[in-house]
Amino acid sequence: RQVCPTGLDKIDSQDILRGGLGRGELGVVAANTGVGKSHFLVAMGCAAMRAGKNVIHYTFELSEHETGKRYDSNLCDIPSNEIIERKKEVVDKYEKMDLGKLIIKEYPSGSASVMTIRNHIEKLTLKGFKPSLVTVDYADVMKSSRAYDSLRHELKLIYTELRNLAGDLNKQIKILQNLTL
């Protein structure tokens, strides 16, 4: 079983995930708005990169630039609001690290479906980029491949298609979901 660590030792333990999320598995992070799900997803991507895994991070809320700053902040241990002014230090730190590669792709909310993501991954694979981990921030705002009267049914279809994508591509996919309680 090939795994990708979450970066959380307790969750990655042999008792729970046996080292991390396995290929073809779908991990869902669900919590209320504003508690740090996007930061957590970045932290999981960084843990995978530190383990030498290649990561694709799809973002539907933040820009590629802001998402990249979060990765830089996490990997270099520099506050994100200081990344730009400490650019030389960031570059120096990266030169000393042995990391997997990262691709960040931004789509406007409601514009990309699971098929869009599948096509993008296949295009990257043809160019030689082989991801071990795919992250989606947020699946809730993706475009459904079918219209339903109920949002619940559309979301169920999106999550089913993401799970199938993970299995078809033999990749770990981690997604975020907003909970409104």
Could you describe each region identified by the protein language model?
Residues 1-78:
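The Walker A/P-loop phosphate-binding site
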Residues 28, 132-135, 174:
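Structural motif
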Residues 13-17, 52-130, 144:
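Cytosolic-facing regulatory segments adjacent to core modules
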Residues 47-49, 154-181:
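Substrate-engagement module of ASCE P-loop NTPases
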Residues 107-112, 142-157, 165:
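Short, contiguous acidic/charged loop-to-helix segments that flank catalytic cores in large enzymes
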Residues 138:
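Walker B catalytic acidic pair
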Residues 24, 52, 130-131, 170:
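A general structural motif
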